Structure formats: C-alpha cells, structure tokens
Amino acid sequence: MQKTEVHSPYNNPLPMDSSWLETLQKIGARIESGVVRDFGNPTAERQATQSSAIFADLSHLAALHFSGKDAESFLQGQLSCDVKAIPQGGSSLGGYCTPKGRMLASFTLLRTQDGFVMLLSTSIAAAIQKRLAMFVLRSQVKIDMPGDGIVLIGLAGPACRDAFSESFDGTFPAGLQVFQLFGERLLLLVPLSSAPATITGICTRFVPVGSGDWQWIEIFLGIPLITAPTQDQLIPQMANMELIGGVSFKKGCYTGQEIVARTQNLGKVKRRMYRAHLEVEASPGDELFSDDLGAQVSGLVVNAQPAPGGGCDLLAVAQVGSHDSSTVHLKTPDGPALKFIPLPYDIT
C-alpha cells in the first residue's frame, strides 16, 4: 500500500498511509510535520475543546505492541504502573524509568485483545522499543510497532461515550477497539480498512480538531508527555505521575522502583509539575528561572500548546518553594513570568 512520507515533531520521520491521509484531507485536515495541524479554523477548534465533543487524529503518538504469553509479566517488571490491574479494554498512565528513577518515557498503556499497546511520543518511540527489547532475554515477548495497519483517534468532551455510541447507532466498524482514558476520554484503535467508516460515524457527533488541541486537553488535565527534550530529567513524582494513576507502590519491583519508592516514603518532593499560562510561545525542555534562585535553573517546560483564549498553556516542573512564594520566568531570570493555573487534582 502506498505511503506518503511525513515528519513527526523533533524530525522523526513516520509513514502516514496515503489512504488515511486522504480520509483526513476529505474532511478538511491540514497536515504539517506529520500531524494534523487543524481542520481549517484553528481558533474555533481550540474553543471547541472547552465545551464540545471533539475528536483528533493522534499521529503525534506512536504505538508499541507487546504480545506473547510473558508480555504482562515482562511489562510489570519494567514499568511504574500496575500492568496486572489493567482490565480488558482499559488503560493506565505510566512511566518507564532508568535505574536512577528518571523517566525515559511517559505513556498510556492499553490492554488489547492480543496483548498490550503503549502509546508514547513519536520522538522517543524507536529508542524505547530498542531499549525494552534488550531486556526481553528468554521471555516470550514480541515488541513491534504496528503503525502500518492501525490509526489512533482520540475522543473527548461532554458525554463522550454516549456521543460515541450514538455515532454508530450500536453497530461499530469491523475491528474497532475502544479504550477508556484518564479524564473522561476515549481512545479508538482502528484498523486502516475501517478508518473511513469510523470517521464518517464520529463526524456526526464530534468536532474534528488538530493534534495540538488534543495535547492542550492533556495539559488541561495535567497529563505529562515526555518527549526527546525532557527524557531522563524527571522522576515520576516531579511530573505528578503518582497523582494520576501512573505509579503503583504495591506492585513490587520494576526498573527505578527503589528511587521512586524512597522519594515517596521520605515525603520530600522538591519539584512538582504545575499548569501555567504565558503570552509568548514555549517549548518542551525550555529552562525556567525564579526570583528566589537567581541564575540557578528552577525547572523546565514539559509540554506547551496554544491556549483557546490566546497565548500559550503549559505544564512546567518547578521548585515547590518557587511556585509558592516567588515568580517563575521562562528561559532567563528576567524572562516572561508564568501565571500559574490550578490543576484538576490536588498536589499539596
């Protein structure tokens, strides 16, 4: 099948199947750097994320597929989340850490009909696949990237599940798998052959939006996405992973577990992830400074996207003391000041 070469963020080439590209373009998609930028009206689409049922193509994410009889036990020993507790059709947020407890990846892990699918940034997927494969050894586990045959679609908004069911009147396209996500959202894992019918159905109830708008929703929900510029920078607690179900302290050993558990038991997390707003652009990995620390780096930007009301919304990790009693600046000690916005969960 023909493919059109496009490029994902951070210059990682990924093939987008030409038939899927055509399906998206028929409903007005404008593709840039390998992802859907928008559907012709970016301002209205950003506004729709706040009040309407929306759907987005998730080509900014890659899917790693884990199969084989040892897939569950293998992942349980590698990842911060409780893999065994994920039900069929369910999902969990999680982190993949170094032995020193720093995250090489954050992800959503789905339990599928034939194993597990890990959704993570395209900028790090190939490296994570290669690293995990090093630890398979004699386990009966296969790790592959099934990008040729599936597409990923995210649904969000008021009464999301009801709107999805109404889109198809109870009769769903062949092979479609549906997963509940954190924050009252759904993820559709769609065989390429069923993608046109799926799009036709959901367009009756959902507003199409760009990839960046879906990422803004995750910023609003306080869900970090580790990308190439932020790898090996944060332990899970710095990114609030234990507050959103991404860390289990009861499951036993996994890579980095000793450091993560010690941090939790000591109760001393000096940096936390906050939601903030800027009137200027920011990018993952941008350094942050604060008045109380002068020229010392106080934190970094994890994710950033254009905000519905203008400017930029972001997830940023900063010193707790700087957040509580100082002013935090972007890139330089006298750079633009961050305006902090409450997250939908408690971090105190």
Question: What kind of feature is each model-predicted range?
Answer:
Residues 189-277:
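Anionic-ligand-binding alpha/beta catalytic cores of soluble enzymes and soluble regulatory domains
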Residues 56-77, 144-160, 268-279:
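Short glycine-/aliphatic-rich beta-strand segments at the starts of folded cytosolic domains
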Residues 42-51, 90-106, 136-139, 168-176, ...:
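Short amphipathic beta-strand starts and helix->beta connectors
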Residues 61, 115, 185, 258, ...:
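Intrinsic-disorder/low-complexity, polar/charged segments enriched in Ser/Thr/Lys/Arg/Asp/Glu/Gln
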Residues 12-14, 38, 114, 174-175, ...:
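Hydrophobic/aromatic-enriched cytosolic interaction surfaces used to assemble or bind macromolecules
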Residues 54-55, 63, 86, 105-221:
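Acidic, low-complexity central loop/insert segments
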